[in-house]
Amino acid sequence: MRILVTNDDSITSEVLLPLAKWAKQFGEVTVVVPKYEQSGKSHCIEIHKAFEVKQVPFDDPDIKAYTVDSSPADCVRYAIEGMKLDFDFVISGINRGLNLGIDMLYSGTVGAVFEAACFGLPAVALSTEPGGFDEAMDALEEVKEFFIKHDLMKKNSLYNVNIPKNHKEIRITRMGGRYFADDFLLQDNDMYLPTGKSVWKDSGDYSIDTNAALTGYISVLPLTLNRTNMDVFQELENLNH
């Protein structure tokens, strides 16, 4: 099995090496990550200019590593179509910061697994809280065994996993709503600094990813690439006749 490991926190991520080493249990690992941090880049790709790709030193002789001076989605796109390698699975992360609710849509970490899905590849996005890398790494075996026990990859090929610090058990979740309110602070020369604050309130429904992860549960959320509202499509399909 050939595994692609990517992220949006760049080659400098402190958890990249341990994650790549952990992934070796599944097969041959290749690391293709952004040269610089790409948080908030979602599923964007570069179509107007060339970008740099370099093989870089990596502290494991079994793993080849490359940096791409572009987005996480471009890392996946280049790894598959530029390197011409037949990957079997994509792991994106471990992100520094949880990717929950609507904020998931802005995530470069999640954008990378959506790009993998565009090529029909199974993929998992992994995220944790700042300062939670060690705990997240320790939890990966538990998450792996949960996936195996319940045949999750046979039921769906795309997941978003959030591992909070001091985590409790694993919960299957669905996407929550907005839990950050944005603000923009005027700087000098018409420049604005984006900021925000949490507006999350615990509703007590722990099938929602925000509620689950922010109260300590490991959130495992099945994703879908197809954004068609099938209920509405099926209701309106007769208009085509």
Q: What is the predicted role of each segment?
A:
Residues A117-M137:
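Glycine-rich phosphate/pyrophosphate-binding loops
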Residues A79-K84, V113-P122:
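Alpha-helix C-terminal capping segments
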Residues M137-H241:
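Electrostatically charged, flexible surface regions
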Residues L98-S107:
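Glycine/threonine-rich flexible loop motifs
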Residues D9:
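Active-site metal-binding loops of divalent metal-dependent hydrolases
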Residues I3, S13-D86:
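A cross-family phosphate/adenosyl-ligand binding-site feature
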Residues T6, V32-P34, S92-N95, L126-S127, ...:
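Short beta-strand segments
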